[in-house]
Amino acid sequence: CKAGCVIINAVECEPYLTADHQLMLEKADEILVGVSILMKAVNVTKGYIGIENNKPDAIKLMTEKAAQYPNIEIVPLKVQYPQGGEKQLIDAVIRRQVPAPPAIPINVGAVVQNVGTAYAVYEAVQKNKPLFERIVTVTGKSVKNPSNFLTRMGTPMSQLIEAAGGLPEDTGKVIGGGPMMGK
């Protein structure tokens, strides 16, 4: 199997998460360089960045910045869970369906990476910086100041919750990973 394109998943994988959105608004140029590096690494000439259409500011900014990259296309996507699922994303962006397992994206010519990965590739290649931190969303009805935090991997959730203003005493449960698939 040969890759024909790189697809960047800029769809938040879970409702209420905003880390990818913030990353695009703050690091659009770096993400696009990362996509270019990924395209070169897998020897393809076409890249796509799929962004849900409820993020018009990110779509606008990424489209403006991508004008310098004729082989990278920003693809607005309808908001539909699980739009960020790899197979759903491939179908929405390039209209190809990944067959049942053991088939994988490369079987339909796609290499899929997350927007955070594109940024991490930029940092690794251009700045020689290893991956040791990422943006994390802390949100929910009980969180006093829902926020995104650039945090080192391994940071305890309790520290992030405190940074977001803490939780009331009667909070029943803290879920790590998102409301749909988290634990």
Predicted features along the sequence, with ranges:
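Conserved "landmark" site that anchors the functional core of diverse proteins
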Residues: 1-3, 21-24, 42
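A general structural motif
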Residues: 3, 44-46, 171
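Gly-rich Lys/Arg/Thr-decorated short loops/hinges at beta-loop-alpha junctions or inter-strand turns
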Residues: 6-20, 142
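Short alpha-helix boundary/capping segments
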Residues: 19-30, 152
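Histidine-anchored nucleotide/phosphate-binding helix
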Residues: 25-41
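Hydrophobic alpha-helical positions that pack around
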Residues: 45-157, 163-168, 178-179
